Design a protein with these regions (language model features):
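Active-site catalytic microenvironments for nucleophilic, acid-base chemistry
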Residues: 4, 53, 60, 233, ...
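A structural signal for the hydrophobic beta-strands that form the central parallel beta-sheet
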Residues: 11-13, 47, 210
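Mid-domain catalytic core of redox enzymes
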Residues: 16-134, 139-148, 152, 164-165, ...
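Conserved flavin/dinucleotide-binding core of flavoenzymes
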Residues: 113-247
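A conserved beta-strand/loop element that lines the FAD pocket in flavoprotein oxidoreductases
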Residues: 5-18
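Helix-loop-beta segment of a Rossmann-like dinucleotide-binding subdomain
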Residues: 2-7, 138-141
Length: 247
């Protein structure tokens, strides 16, 4: 798939973009270190970064969009993945185990805010039975203390809360902790108006579009939708005659 996405062009990874500026013919990206910068000219640019780096890149070329992007807060979280033997996991059936997972309201005071029974949710994982995978999302906005625990302690906490919530007391046969520092955008009151203002400001910059989780949701469908919309905007712009692209 990666080959098809870049054909007939090329993809560059691990290339830090330090600045973005509008030119007479499109956009110029400053890449690399300050001591040895590289300049890349582009007809159009899609920013698919989190809000903070997008705000930094747009500060000079789209100040209103940058200001509104800077208002979007982010929270940190961790995913604790636990693997159980099937006979251990389902010794005590609960309504939650017959679904794809459950959510935990903040009022409960638990560190785990959501649980997904991945093996039940995704049919292709069922082939891995008798090992079943359970994913626990840990961390809430404004609560960073729990994420200061080391991996072993955090995994033990998730397993304990799983037992307390739905009675799974089996010992996991494997565990993994994946941390996402500042990776979860928060959609506070006024977010829809904020996003509308960002998109209106960006629309006034020919050949520029934005996409990603900062706008319409963190789920894959929402992110794909923003990507399709951004791609359509850029394609429509590039379809214009060269002489009309600056307008």
């Amino acid at each position: 798939m990666s080959g098809e996405l870049t054909e007939p062009g090329r993809a560059r990874t691990n290339a830090m973009v330090r600045a973005l500026e509008r030119t007479a013919t499109g956009w110029r990206l400053t890449i690399g270190s300050a001591a040895d910068p590289e300049y890349l000219d582009a007809d159009a640019v899609i920013l698919a970064t989190p809000a903070a780096p997008a705000a930094r890149l747009l500060k000079d070329s789209a100040g209103e969009a940058a200001a509104r992007l800077a208002e979007i807060p982010y929270a940190s979280m961790a995913i604790v993945t636990l693997a159980f033997r099937g006979e251990d996991l389902f010794q005590q059936q609960s309504p939650a185990q017959q679904r794809s997972g459950y959510l935990v309201p903040a009022v409960d005071g638990r560190a785990v805010k959501a649980v997904t029974f991945s093996t039940l949710k995704w049919p292709h994982l069922a082939a891995q039975a008798p090992v079943h995978v359970v994913r626990c999302s840990v961390g809430r906005s404004g609560d960073v203390a729990v994420l200061q625990r080391d991996d072993e302690d955090l995994a033990a906490l998730a397993a304990a809360e799983l037992a307390g919530a739905i009675g799974i007391t089996a010992t996991p046969v494997a565990r993994r902790v994946t941390r996402w520092g500042g990776g979860l955008p928060q959609y506070n009151v006024g977010h829809l108006d904020r996003v509308a203002a960002i998109r209106a400001a960006v629309a006034g910059r020919p050949g520029l579009a934005v996409a990603g989780a900062a706008y319409d949701g963190v789920g894959i469908p929402a992110c794909v939708s923003t990507a399709k919309s951004a791609a359509a905007q850029v394609l429509a712009y590039l379809a214009r005659p060269q002489a009309l692209r600056a307008t």
